[in-house]
Amino acid sequence: MTAPAISVNLNKGQADMSKTSWIRSSGLGFAVLVGFAVPAGAGTLDSVKQRGTLQCGVSEGVAGFSEKDTQGDWRGFDVDFCRAVASAVLGDAGKVAFTPLSASQRFDALKGGKVDLLARNSTWTLGREAELGLAFAGITYHDGQGFLAKRALKADTALSLDKAKICVEAGTTTQLNLADFFKANSMTYEEKVYPSAAEAFAAFESGQCDVLTRDQSALHGDRLRLAKPAEAIVLPDVISKEPLGPVVRSDDFPWFTLVKWVNFALVNAEELGVSSTNVDEALKSQKPDVRRFIGAEGGFGKALGLEADWAVRAVKVGGNYAEIYERNLGTGSKLGIPRGLNQLWSMGGVLYAPPLR
């Protein structure tokens, strides 16, 4: 049964944040929040190594990013990123536990220590870093907010949506962007707010609204999940910038640096031509930039608290950025989303990583 639309209490997150801040300032630390013993002064990296498992927060089910397959195994772009981090840190891509989180749960779960890393198609914003005590470890996917509309509405662009009933998930930048877009274009709409993406989708499918709005990448998967996909269309408009990326707590700079550089390593691997299929051959390379990548020169693994071959580990199982993208979102997936902005900067996109130097 589809949950009824609800009103959102915008002050709850502020109250939760205040409680978390008090606990931090009181010196109680993460041991209180996490629910298991953490040695005094231990950072996230030490905790992950001692536990032997990376705790990764993902979505409750977004096609191409994080969802369970028919065997119950987690698959997707964000899932593969978590596995790359686990492989770099623990030497085993399988040593990761996935925790599905709704949009309203995700940041509290991260702040409270329930997860070590959030890879849950989350948009990097000023407020989330400055107000919530979080840090985004780069951008893994350049997205934008779009609209999935019933063909019966006869809308061909977002400007055709005046007076439409629109389903949206609570606790997201999507709500804010929606209000800004309609106000800027002197249009009105009826907002139907739901506590999870799944409930917003169910409401759209059952006819409680004419339009579903969220990140455009997710809408392609939503359309395919409909009983009659041909009766809905993803409109071409993108009304916002949605830089999606992994998130960590802002009070652990070494862990932030590590996660950020695993992200960069996947991009650098694509630039260097290092992939899951040829990484063993790369170990024989005499090119200086490749030798730094494989850990033969530079000593960067030690600086991160990792083994010298940390970047090789990250790529060996799941592949470089291109392999991860194409398998989950691009030509090798059911979604078939063109890379667009997510192409390398040298190929017409904006994907760029600092050098391993």
Regions found by a protein language model. Give the residues of each.
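Extracytoplasmic small-molecule ligand-binding "clamshell" domains
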Residues: K49-A119, L304-L306, V317-Y321, L344, ...
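C-terminal functional modules
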Residues: F300-R357
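Short helix-initiation/N-cap motifs at beta->coil->alpha
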Residues: V96-D108, E191-S206
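Bilobed "Venus flytrap"/periplasmic-binding protein-like clamshell domains
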Residues: Q55-G64, W74-V89, T123, D143-P195, ...
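Bacterial N-terminal signal peptides
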Residues: S25-A37
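Bacterial N-terminal signal peptides that target proteins for export
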Residues: V8-N11, D16-L28
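Extended ligand-binding regions for polar small-molecule ligands
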Residues: D80-R83, S87-V89, R151-A155, L159, ...
